[in-house]
């Protein structure tokens, strides 16, 4: 059951890039805000990201092999396509913070837990557009609004 819940959290990653129907970022906060206070902290993002790694590390060797990462990429892509997301932000999309080329620091085609987790602070900073130390739906409102 926990793997199902974590997989749902993973495939909801695309939702953080744009609004689903309603308030931009609301679904991201719903899935990543572990204490329910309406804001995602770096600690919460780190914990959830570790959960995501565990979900896709099928053989539990602390490495996402190319095949395991392919499954992760496919889950994210399917969610983004199903929700009409991923257009308009290009390489600057916060969703890109989990791409293999971002997380595979040594370029060997596999992503270790350390590589995946060491990318969290930069990814989180990209989400926290107002630099207040938390990610809220306000961080997803298009600039100029």
Cite the ranges covered by each PLM segment:
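The feature marks the first
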Residues: 24-38
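Sec-dependent N-terminal signal peptides
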Residues: 4-13
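Intrinsically disordered, low-complexity Ser/Thr-rich linker and spacer segments
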Residues: 71-102
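Beta-propeller blade repeat segments, especially FG-GAP/WD-type strand-to-loop junctions
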Residues: 54, 86, 125-131
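Blade-edge motifs of beta-propeller repeat domains
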Residues: 39-41, 85-90, 110-112
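Amphipathic regulatory helices of Ca2+-sensor modules
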Residues: 28, 42-51, 66-79, 113-122, ...
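Acidic carboxylate motifs that coordinate Ca2+ or other divalent cations, activating on Asp/Glu
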Residues: 33-37, 57-61, 104-108, 128-132
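Boundary of Sec targeting at the N-terminus
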Residues: 18-20
């Amino acid at each position: 059951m926990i793997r199902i819940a974590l997989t749902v959290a993973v495939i909801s990653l695309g939702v953080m890039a744009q609004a689903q129907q309603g308030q931009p970022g609301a679904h991201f906060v719903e899935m990543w805000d572990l204490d329910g206070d309406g804001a995602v902290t770096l600690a919460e993002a780190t914990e959830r990201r570790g959960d995501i790694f565990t979900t896709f590390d099928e053989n539990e060797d602390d490495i996402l092999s190319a095949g395991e990462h392919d499954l992760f990429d496919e889950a994210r892509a399917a969610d983004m396509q199903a929700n009409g997301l991923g257009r308009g932000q290009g390489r600057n999309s916060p969703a890109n913070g989990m791409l293999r080329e971002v997380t595979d620091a040594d370029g060997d085609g596999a992503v270790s837990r350390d590589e995946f987790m060491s990318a969290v602070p930069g990814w989180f900073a990209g989400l926290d557009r107002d630099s207040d130390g938390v990610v809220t739906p306000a961080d997803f409102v298009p600039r100029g609004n």
